[in-house]
Curated annotation (Swiss-Prot):
Paired cysteines (S-S): none
Post-translational modification: Contains 7 disulfide bonds.
GO molecular function, one term: toxin activity
Keyword Secreted: yes
Signal peptide per UniProt: none
Compartments, record wording: Secreted
Source species taxonomy: Eukaryota, Metazoa, Chordata, Craniata, Vertebrata
Highest taxon in the source lineage: Eukaryota
Alphabetically ordered keywords of this record: Disulfide bond, Myotoxin, Secreted, Toxin
Name assigned to this protein: Basic phospholipase A2 homolog CTs-K49c
Task of the protein: Snake venom phospholipase A2 homolog that lacks catalytic activity. Shows myotoxic activities. Induces local edema a few hours after injection (5-10 ug) in the hind paw.
Length: 23
């Protein structure tokens, strides 16, 4: 799910998913 994907990215980057996607 999108929430789980966001959590994974959060753990990997330590930042907000929005920052990772550059949205």
């Amino acid at each position: 799910s999108v929430i789980e994907l966001g959590k994974m990215i959060l753990q990997e980057t330590g930042k907000n998913p929005v920052t990772h996607y550059g949205a």
